[in-house]
Amino acid sequence: MVDAGGRCAAEGWRRMEAPPEGADLVPLDRYDAARAKIAANLQWICAKAYGLDNIPEDLRDPFYIDQYEQEHIKPPVIKLLLSSELYCRVCSLILKGDQVATLQGHQSVIQALSRKGIYVMESDDTPVTDADLSQAPIKMSGHMAMVDALMMAYTVEMISIEKVVASVKRFSTFSASKELPYDLEDAMVFWINKVNLKMREITEKEVKLKQQPLESPAHQKVRYRREHLSARQSPYFPLLEDLMRDGSDGAALLAVVHYYCPEQMKLDDICLKEVPSMADSLYNIRLLREFSNEHLNKCFYLTLEDMLYAPLVLKPNVMVFIAELFWWFENVKPDFVQPRDIQELKDAKTVLQQKSSRPPVPISNATKRSFLGSPAAMSPADQPPSTQPLAEGSHRYHLHSEEPECLGKGASTFSPSHPLLPLRQKQQKVSQTEEIPDQRHRSNSLTRVDGQPRGAIGAWPDKKNRPVSQPTSFALHHAASCDVDPSSGDSVSLARSISKDSLASNIIHLTPQNQPHPSAGKSNGKSLLSNVNIEDEDEELVAIIRTDVSPPSPQMPRTSPQAPGLVASIRSPQRQADTLESKPDSFYLEPLMPAVLRPAKEKQITTKEDERGEGRPRTIMAKRPSEGSQPMVRKKVSGGHGSRDLNRTFTPIPCSEFAASIDLAEVGPQSAEATGEGQPLALGRFDTLPQGQAADGFFLHVGRAEEDEGRWYVGSQSPSSHDSEPWTILRQDSDSDVVDVEDTEQDFIGEDHPVVIPRYAGEEESAKLQEDMKVKEHEDKDDASGRSSPCLSTTSQLSSMSMASGSVKMTSFAERKLQRLNSCETKSSTSSSQKTTPDASESCPAPLTTWRQKREQSPGRHSKDPASLLASELVQLHMQLEEKRRAIEAQKKKMEALSARQRLKLGKAAFLHVVKKGKADGAPQPLRPEHFTKEFTQHNGEDLDDGTCKTEGFLVKEEQRDLSDAQDVAFVQLHKPRDPAALHDGEKHRMISTALLEDSVGEVDVNECDLSIEKLNETISTLQQAILKISQQQEQLLMKSPTVPTPGTKNNCQDQKIKAPVHFVEPLSPTGVPGHRKPPRLGQGRNSRSGRPAELKVPKDRQQGCSRSKTPTPSVETLPQSRSLPPSTHPRSPSDPGGELPEKCLFDSYRLHDESNHRTFVLSSCKDANIVSEQVNFKEGLDTSVKEAGLSSSTITGKEHTPVEEPLRSKASLIEVDLSDLKAPDEDGEVVGHESSVELGGDSDQKPGVGFFFKDEQKAEDELAKKRAAFLLKQQRKAEEARARKQQLEAEVELKRDEARRKAEEDRLRKEEEKARRELIKQEYLRRKQQQALEEQGLGKPKSKPKKPRPKSVHREESYSDSGTKCSSTHNLSQTHSGSSLSLASAATTEPESVYSGGTPSHRVESLEALPILSRNPSRSTDRDWETASAASSLASVAEYTGPKLFKEPSSKSNKPIIHNAISHCCLAGKVNEPHKNSILELEKCDANHYIILFRDAGCQFRALYCYQPDTEEIYKLTGTGPKSITKKMIDKLYKYSSDRKQFNLIPAKTMSVSVDALTIHNHLWQPKRPTVPKKTQTRK
């Protein structure tokens, strides 16, 4: 159990602190899907072949870069692929038994897969052969297909449609007819969607249950509650439609993971938004990867980008991952897999069993009476445990079925057999490592200041406790449960939602002095937790102190200190039975009842003995005077029964300590049990404590819980530990509370319980930490935002711890970042300081030292006499005043910043001027502030959240540093502690940056801003002075000869580990190039404070937008640590507190992005390369980040000047080079100096850049020259490339423009020609009509036969011959039908609808004639004759009929002339077809009026001639090949002949009429060709 707990907590921390590896995400435009596919496939196959941890070194990264910077696959990898070894290994894992032996070579693997129904096919569906796979040079596509096939085989082994359906049936229903998946991908989508729907259902139930109590009218209004609920965003469980597209944000998969492993993956940790930003998706994907690495044997073989961009080529990879998830959750089912619905049932059962097995503890009559306010309340409590509703205990936050009592409903008589908080016990058993579900309560609504319990408190149950480790499960789970959850959606900075004074004071009231007088019911002498443990996350209190005073039980409804060492039943991270998530449904089995007001204790006659029950001897803690607001937890321990005052801030302890603390914890209960049968139960409210349970303690952190448990147990171990002390809750806001607690704790330990000595090793530290943490957190809170955010306050230990444990609720990404930044910073420092293992150094031992110093300074820390308590009170008072002071300062700064910001907007020129001047003087550092501020102004809407919190964090730390009087130079002062101007300058910058950051959070009146413009001017002048000084110093420095390296440098190397990790950030390019934006976070250890993964989570899109580098508080980390090291150990400036990274990475990790206006640095010293590079990079980063953190630019130069830096200086001297000459003139923005960075983010104008070269004293000057030359070459090359690219682009654009112009011209010409042609046709038509009229009048046929229209024909030929080739349909004519059917074919096949196509058909015809090749008519004149005639005939004009003389003229209603023309000039044109044509034209003798041509198909090959009778609608054959008659049903398409165009056009009609000239019949009516068919019919053009 313990392990589970430890694991859980540790996971939480890991989740929060793991450095974001994806900080430098590859932007989509630079993401190469093909390369990603190769990398992912190779990683998968190597991992499967060798096991992820045993992959040979040279295969881990399959790519290498040659000297031309081209990327290639490494030869060993290629060799392996060609040899088929990998494939055989992996395939053997899938195959069974003797089949494995046959695997030798590619072919056998291909065959083995095909036997399983999986075929190795390339993307174009060509099968991959052995030859493809053995081919050299390697044919990668074949190998990728092979790996995909193996992945599919793996997938098929792990998941199948049947398995998915069986799995889904267990927790959901579905419609077999509609929803059954049809393939594996669909099955995966089906499974994921069903789990997400189930999660929706669970969360909806929880929300309803939560709202029920809230809506109940019985709630009394006394309670102070903020209604943030509506603002909270419920988690959105997405449903997938497309596996790749919709699953790429990781949310759906994480919801599945949460469903199966609610303890390992808290719902609060997952970012479940309806429209997740890129940062949210990244965060989720990272979370998924971490979970897989930690619990699923590292089965996530993709990069963040692969998942985020989800290219289709990676579908097999994603599918194999999902299959593996399914396999783990449904087949393997390790211990941590406990699906939520099933787990809820189990939890409920466990609770019942534990209830029944709990040893009876006597409860005094008085206590029982005190609970008997109303008969209603009795019921549940009295029921035998077995009858208690199952999940009740498990789900109510109150932790026990007797909830009603808690609710204040009234008192059920608690029979000893089921103590009030049955869960407690269970939890205890389950894991001592659990955190207590601190009851969060609203400020002093719990107890009045006068100490009278409010009856209303009973109404509180709606505030369910939530394991700290999971602060608020996603606010929506129980929105009510957090007043102001740090995670609540609206808190921009956690602090925001709470007003400073109210909280601090409130909670202080809860502390022992203000506690209500001893509550009426101390049943069995165990006093009730006097104030409910509060963990509001926003208004959290830190510790629960046991004091003799304990408020009446009603107050305690929610407290749960009962587990032996766990106050308030520390909930196991597994939250057995408590976690909302795990048992949502049953969470509230009983409705909340109104609280019953009980008479004040003073009015009752119950004696202490009665209250205690049977007058057992118990030590009573002296009542605390309630006069002071600083809770001093003094306890008189009478009779040697030391009351255990476990008043502690909760600090997480690293896992390494878990074991120890756990042992203690476990020992505790036993010894406690040994002590005697009845440990009194915490005031009735709390359920009797079985003897083994010490009712004290309340941790926010699992780790802490254990520590405290250990300790607490110790307390309870002593036989005399029966004493009952009420629990007091300390508000962490009062700093000294913690101090007091600890002191008292120690007092009590020292005096009465030698046993206590076994405190686990880390404990001492943690105690120290607490005080410091508290201070720090206060600072965080106040400083950060000028408001007290209880979250950040010491209490934030509570929330922060809880957050730290990985369950920060993410309502909005920014909040999460913020919370993590602040709370985790504190947490990490705490936990790290406790670490005793060597790696702990990573975490930040340095601060530890500081804390230790601080702790030693704090008088009461170790002293065991009351005097120390007094001192602690003073400290507390001091802290409170300090808080107020800070708040005021923050407000002031905010105003100044606002004005500064406006000023910056207006007076950019002034700043630039200063900057340039500074640069000329050789101190470019100061330039950054403007850059940074400007960026802020531009992007203030975007990154503000982060920025604010980071800056706040920095300020906090800075003040903390001031408070603790560290001897080292402050970060800001690093440059030159003695230089007041610089310091002042630094301060100003800090103010400006803070203000800028905060400004976005809350706007201040513009008028007020004007007031502070003067200050800004002052700042500017100070800045100028500072710049001058710095430049002078720099010059001096350069002139000085470097000193010999001192041993300090050596220390430095060792100290690197200790120093706080520094956050290196390269200044962003003004254009916001995403690639340059990565905060490398070189030194960031897991616990480093400044670098929470939060930054990482900054949405990439935002990152691109704002060029501000995001280093939350580079200095923050460094400060305490640097303080703790003596100056000699600082070869580097504290600002550069050596990263923990191995030296080798430092150099590489910092590519200088010359293109993006960063400074360029070349490091020449190799011995110190990593140190120098850190500095250099840091310098780059600092320019921005320092400003961001609110430091003066002088800090940067500090590196060169600080005495501490002496060793470093000795190694390398600084040479400044102007880079402007290194850069090709037209290379825009490639090496841009700081000025440009000062300008707007998007401004990429070229500015001269300054490069720093560190010159190693021992190296020859020529080495420097070489490097410079190389650098110049590189620059030049880049410039040329850029030039070439630019030229190429311009050429392309020009070409496109020409093309467009040419097309427009053609269109214009075509239109003009068309117009002219139409005019000609019209004229011709009018002329013919006139002739026809004349003819009808008997004037005789005009003599103008075919010759007249010739000009038209000629004209057309001329005008179109040039454009014919351009005509759109010319290509249609290339249909190669033999014979003369060309124009027919063209019309019918490719543009059958040409009827509607406007003018194009005519073009087509013209172009036909214009292209002799296409026009098969041997003589042009015939064409022209025909054309004239056809025009006439189409008008039914007999006058123009030019058929052979032997025919009689057709009547005007006949289409005979048209058919005649069609056959002679189109269907059967040419000499070849002449005999056939003539035989058909003999039909002229036929009497029929209307003829129809039958075509074979859309190609318009002539087949037969038919006669059509319009009256009877009969169509019968005259000659040719085809059916004897054609009915309506047989007709497929209808055509009309256009005489002037000599082509048939498709008619969109379906019914026959006299306007139809040709038709086709359905294809199936044609029989295969018979040899008898004359070939002539085939020869169509």
Curated annotation (Swiss-Prot):
Interacts with spectrin via SPTBN1; the interaction is direct. Interacts with calmodulin; calcium-dependent it prevents interaction with spectrin. It holds the Pfam family CAMSAP_CKK. One of its GO terms (biological process) is regulation of microtubule polymerization. Belongs to the CAMSAP1 family. Key microtubule-organizing protein that specifically binds the minus-end of non-centrosomal microtubules and regulates their dynamics and organization. Specifically recognizes growing microtubule minus-ends and stabilizes microtubules. Acts on free microtubule minus-ends that are not capped by microtubule-nucleating proteins or other factors and protects microtubule minus-ends from depolymerization. The modification Phosphothreonine is found at residue 511. The modification Phosphotyrosine is found at residue 1516. The keyword Phosphoprotein applies. Residues 899-918 are annotated as: Sufficient for interaction with calmodulin. Residues 792-803, 826-837, 1373-1390 have a biased composition (Low complexity). Residues 603-617, 765-785, 853-865, 1092-1103, 1225-1237 have a biased composition (Basic and acidic residues). It comes from Mus musculus. This is Calmodulin-regulated spectrin-associated protein 1. Residues 1104-1132, 1361-1372 have a biased composition (Polar residues). The lineage of its organism: Eukaryota, Metazoa, Chordata, Craniata, Vertebrata.
